[in-house]
Swiss-Prot record:
<dbReference type="InterPro" id="IPR005823">
    <property type="entry name" value="Ribosomal_uL13_bac-type"/>
</dbReference>
<dbReference type="InterPro" id="IPR005822">
    <property type="entry name" value="Ribosomal_uL13"/>
</dbReference>
<dbReference type="Pfam" id="PF00572">
    <property type="entry name" value="Ribosomal_L13"/>
</dbReference>
<dbReference type="InterPro" id="IPR036899">
    <property type="entry name" value="Ribosomal_uL13_sf"/>
</dbReference>
<dbReference type="GO" id="GO:0017148">
    <property type="term" value="P:negative regulation of translation"/>
</dbReference>
<dbReference type="GO" id="GO:0003729">
    <property type="term" value="F:mRNA binding"/>
</dbReference>
<comment type="subunit">
    <text>Part of the 50S ribosomal subunit.</text>
</comment>
<keyword id="KW-0689">Ribosomal protein</keyword>
<dbReference type="GO" id="GO:0003735">
    <property type="term" value="F:structural constituent of ribosome"/>
</dbReference>
<dbReference type="GO" id="GO:0022625">
    <property type="term" value="C:cytosolic large ribosomal subunit"/>
</dbReference>
<comment type="function">
    <text>This protein is one of the early assembly proteins of the 50S ribosomal subunit, although it is not seen to bind rRNA by itself. It is important during the early stages of 50S assembly.</text>
</comment>
<protein>
    <recommendedName>
        <fullName>Large ribosomal subunit protein uL13</fullName>
    </recommendedName>
</protein>
<dbReference type="InterPro" id="IPR023563">
    <property type="entry name" value="Ribosomal_uL13_CS"/>
</dbReference>
<dbReference type="GO" id="GO:0006412">
    <property type="term" value="P:translation"/>
</dbReference>
<keyword id="KW-0687">Ribonucleoprotein</keyword>
<comment type="similarity">
    <text>Belongs to the universal ribosomal protein uL13 family.</text>
</comment>
Length: 140
């Protein structure tokens, strides 16, 4: 039997409406689409996933007390450079970053993961500039 060598496949564009969807459950579906694990010919070392456009990221839902208790931290490397931002404030100022952060943690770390992450397009409102690619609406 010959060794299977995967070919580069033409990615499709998918549109997902995040309104009323739970953050983590939606992020896992998006990560699966980005990696291409929904395809029967999936190969771990090839970027064969789809481009994913997410709209209405500002209307995403979280369960429990996460709005007040979940805190995003980042460190600049300097003394006193630790920034802490609660989820509630992050949703108010940059709602697309919340979903991007959740999906990025579910992708592989390394060059392939960075390449896959570039295929994710998240927008706070209902409009997006990817009409020319004719993304197909996917119900999650």
């Amino acid at each position: 039997m010959k060794t299977y060598v995967p070919k580069q496949v033409e990615p499709r564009w998918v549109l997902i409406d995040a309104e009323g969807k739970t953050l983590g459950r939606l992020a896992t579906k998006i990560a699966t689409l980005l990696r291409g694990k929904h395809r029967p010919d999936w190969t771990p070392n090839v970027a064969m996933g789809d481009f994913v456009v997410v709209v209405n990221a500002d209307k995403i839902r979280v369960t429990g007390k996460k709005l007040e208790q979940k805190i995003y931290t980042r460190y600049s490397g300097y003394p006193g450079g630790l920034k802490k931002i609660p989820l509630e404030k992050m949703l108010a100022t940059h709602p697309e970053r919340v979903l991007e952060h959740a999906v990025k943690g579910m992708l592989p770390k390394g060059p392939l993961g960075r390449r896959l992450f570039k295929r994710l397009k998240v927008y706070a409102g209902p409009d997006h500039p990817h009409q020319a690619q004719r993304p197909e609406k996917l119900e999650v």
